[in-house]
Each structure stands twice: as structure tokens, then as C-alpha cells.
Design a protein with these regions (language model features):
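RNase H-like, metal-dependent nuclease domains and their acidic two-metal-ion catalytic environment used
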Residues: 151, 193, 199-204, 256, ...
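Conserved P-loop NTPase catalytic core
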Residues: 202-290
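Conserved nucleotide-state-sensing and coupling region of NTP-binding domains
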Residues: 83-145
Length: 394
């Protein structure tokens, strides 16, 4: 294909991706891969702050590495910063990008010239003007981001189990991500690539910071599961079910993973791990990992002496109680009763439970639970500081 066609700025990234796949001797890009390319591949229409959440093995990094080449082909003066959880991972991304430039005939004019930077961690492209920042640079998320400048930031798998196990780790990671705003040039683009590693993943926080998330799960979600994704599933996935007649539960990309392959991986990963890594469903992971949930409780006004004979419970969206602050895990909700039936009659029993604190900073907690008809009613609770002193226990 003549290089002049590329430089006309009329060639879509999807077509360029097909040329890259052909050079790598890979099968043609799958519909899912082309949909991801369409989401990130138009510098004018694509989100300036995008999150690509797609199942493991779909080729997110390969696609985005080709996108870096595509952007450099259209404008050799842009600067790209590749950030990953580990420096090695970021270097692998930039090395692959560099090899594409040196091996594909259509990219030969981007090959670094004599006197330009030419290493796997930092390199220039041939036509670029002299600048402090290299055309492509790789760095770890804990490295020195300050001082860098970039028109395109690729955050490739910045969340891994070793840096997201605790709330403190996730907060530290979130602060590191804020540095992107200081690095990004005006009008620049940030693309996050990854899969959630925990139920309180940093990716779920980023939309509140102005990022747009799009999700490509490994299976078409059931109708009841769609709400859990908060409208972030790719429209292409939804259209395949609503208009093309695909059945929920079938593989979204059978050319990559067949149903048999997904079943084997689900058995190997476990339901919770598969939900995170392949279905990108953090709420399902919470339900599997934590048997006691706030959504198991019924929130209602109670009397200290009597209670209704029957209560009907249902987790329906219109029964959610949003007036009470949610202090549970992401995706959990408070629910009102669906129906209150029968007469209000006296409780059958009452228990006062006390959990004394140690000598640390925790509190002595207490609660009063009353019983009626197989239901337990929490009518009072509280906490007192002071350990187990006479004043507290009295």
C-alpha cells in the first residue's frame, strides 16, 4: 500500500491495523479487535481520556502499539509516553513499537536517524524535530513522571495484584495517576488498558475524574447483568445481542476464545477470578468473595416493642434506598422492603450483644437484636470509646 495514502489522513486506524496484523502474519483482526481500534483510533472523535477494559488475551497492547505507530505516521512530532506497573512491561511495549517501525516498509521513514535517540526505552522517529522529549518513552508508574511531556499517554496494565492489594496501595496508585495531568500536553490523549485486579479497582474510580470507560467482556452478558456495567459495555456488544441475535452467555470473540476454552479458564480461575479477568464484572466478584453484604439487609423504620408479621424482600432498582450513605463495597446497595404484611405484634425475644474493645483505639460496640417469625430486627446499636473500663461496661 502506497505510503501517500496514509499521509492523506483519510485512512482509518482499522485499515492500518489490518496491515499490521498482515505484517505479523496473524489472522485478520477480529470484530472485537476492530471495535477497540475504532474506539481509540480517531484522534478527532475518540475520547481524550479513554479506558479500554477488555478480557485477557484480546490483544489490547498490540492494538495500542499499532495505534502509536499510526499516530506517529500522521504526525511525527507527537510525543508518546508508555506507563506500566513495571518498567519491564513498559519497555516491552516500546520495544514492540520500535520493531514495527523498523520492520514495516510503510513505516521506514520513521526509523531513527544518525544522532537521534534509538533505544528500547527511549527513541525518536526520523522526521521529528529536535526536542527534549523523545518520540516514544517507557517508564514504570513508580518512576519519575515529573518533567516528562507527552501528547499521547498509554497506561498499560498499571494495576496489578502487587500494587492494589490494600486500600493504601490503591490510594498511592491513584495519586500517581494524577501526575498524568501535569505531563499531558494541551489537546493530548490518555488511554488506559487493563483488566480489574480487585473489587475496588482503580479503573472504577477514573470515570469520576473525567475518563470514559468502555468494556468488552468475554461473554455476552445476560440481560440481568447489563445494569452492573453501568452502561459502559461497548455498543457493539449490545447490538450483537439486540439486533444480530447472539445469545447471552456465548463468547463475544469466538475466534479468540471458544466456549470450551472459556469453560476451562473459568474452572481454572474460579468464578470470582473469571468475573474479574474475563467478564470485567467487579460487582459479581464482590458477591462471590464476601458472603455477608449490605444488600442482604432490609432498611425500614422499626418499633422497639412490635414488628410486622411478614416482610417481603426483593433486590429491585426501584427499592434502592439512596438516602443512607453507602459504606460497603462498590456495587452494594441498601434496599427497602417490597411489602409489609399482617399485623404489628410483640417481638418473641431480644438479645443484647456486646463486643468489648482491647486496649487499642477501637471501640466497645453493642447492638440490640429482636426476633419475630424467623426474622431478626436490629433496633439499636452503638459504640463507646474507653476499652473495657468500669465506666464503659457500666
Amino acid at each position: 500500500m502506497d505510503r501517500g495514502i496514509y499521509l492523506s489522513n483519510r485512512l482509518t486506524f482499522q485499515v492500518f491495523l489490518k496491515e499490521v496484523w498482515k505484517h505479523l502474519r496473524l489472522p485478520p483482526p477480529t470484530p472485537i479487535q476492530l471495535d477497540i481500534a475504532d474506539y481509540i483510533g480517531d484522534p478527532q472523535k475518540s475520547p481524550r481520556r479513554a479506558i479500554v477494559e477488555a478480557f485477557r488475551g484480546v490483544g489490547k497492547s498490540y492494538i495500542t502499539s499499532a495505534y502509536v505507530c499510526y499516530r506517529l505516521l500522521l504526525n511525527p512530532d507527537i510525543k508518546c509516553l508508555v506507563v506500566s506497573a513495571s518498567k519491564v512491561r513498559a519497555d516491552d511495549f516500546s520495544t514492540f513499537t520500535q520493531r514495527l517501525i523498523k520492520e514495516m516498509p510503510i513505516l521506514e521513514e520513521l526509523i531513527p536517524r544518525e544522532g537521534q535517540r534509538d533505544s528500547k526505552i527511549s527513541f525518536d522517529v526520523g522526521p521529528t524535530k529536535a526536542a527534549h522529549a523523545p518520540s516514544v518513552k517507557s517508564i514504570g508508574i513508580t518512576g519519575q513522571l515529573s518533567g516528562s511531556r507527552a501528547d499521547l499517554i498509554i497506561a498499560d496494565d498499571i494495576e496489578i495484584p502487587s500494587n492494589s492489594q490494600t486500600q493504601m496501595m490503591r490510594e498511592k496508585l491513584g495519586e500517581s495517576i494524577k501526575e498524568f495531568d501535569a505531563v499531558l500536553s494541551p489537546g493530548g490523549q490518555v488511554i488506559f488498558l487493563g483488566t480489574p485486579q480487585c473489587e475496588q479497582t482503580i479503573y472504577d474510580i477514573l470515570p469520576s475524574r473525567g475518563y470514559e470507560m468502555r468494556i468488552w467482556p468475554a461473554r455476552f452478558p445476560l440481560e440481568a447483568q447489563r445494569d452492573k456495567y453501568l452502561g459502559r459495555i461497548s455498543p457493539f456488544i449490545n447490538e450483537m445481542v439486540d439486533k444480530a441475535g447472539m445469545n447471552p452467555g456465548e463468547p463475544t470473540d469466538p475466534l479468540r476464545f471458544s466456549e470450551e476454552d472459556l469453560i476451562e479458564r473459568e474452572l481454572s480461575y474460579g468464578k470470582s477470578g473469571f468475573a474479574l479477568q474475563f467478564m470485567l464484572d467487579t460487582s459479581l466478584s464482590d458477591m462471590d468473595r464476601y458472603p455477608l453484604k449490605i444488600s442482604d439487609l432490609i432498611v425500614m423504620d422499626l418499633n422497639t416493642d412490635t414488628a410486622p408479621e411478614t416482610l417481603v424482600f426483593q433486590r429491585a432498582p426501584y427499592l434502592q434506598n439512596d438516602e443512607i450513605p453507602m459504606v460497603g463495597l462498590h456495587g452494594d446497595k441498601w434496599y427497602r422492603p417490597l411489602d409489609i404484611g399482617g399485623k404489628w405484634i410483640p417481638y418473641e425475644g431480644s438479645v443484647l450483644a456486646v463486643d468489648p474493645s482491647g486496649r487499642g483505639r477501637d471501640e466497645t460496640s453493642w447492638c440490640v437484636v429482636k426476633m419475630l417469625g424467623g426474622n431478626l430486627f436490629l433496633v439499636a446499636q452503638g459504640g463507646i470509646q474507653g476499652g473495657y473500663s468500669d465506666e464503659v461496661m457500666g
